[in-house]
């Protein structure tokens, strides 16, 4: 449980927070998630804490590996997109929508 935010928070260690790019939220099916948000009267944050928002899997990889991982995913006909990045933190790890 915990939706996309909860899933991302669980994999963070104490040194990093995750910056989730707002422009990529719900992008696999914006109409569906906008409809759900409106019908359920949910905020963006509540949506992200409740649903995975179309993301079946999140890979966190080193930027140096992006080209190779992209090649592999393309070869497997897997759709993917970059949805954010890690940021060093001295506080508690968290997911921030930016």
Model features per residue range: what roles?
Residues 1-98:
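Glycine-/charge-enriched secondary-structure boundary and capping motifs
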């Amino acid at each position: 449980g915990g939706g996309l935010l909860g899933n991302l928070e669980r994999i963070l260690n104490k040194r990093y927070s995750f910056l989730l790019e707002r422009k990529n939220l719900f992008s696999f099916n914006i109409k569906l998630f906008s409809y759900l948000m409106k019908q359920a009267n949910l905020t963006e944050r509540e949506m992200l804490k409740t649903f995975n928002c179309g993301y079946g899997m999140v890979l966190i990889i080193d930027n140096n590996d992006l080209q190779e991982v992209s090649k592999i995913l393309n070869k497997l006909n897997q759709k993917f997109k970059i949805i954010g990045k890690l940021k060093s933190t001295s506080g508690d790890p968290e997911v921030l929508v930016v």
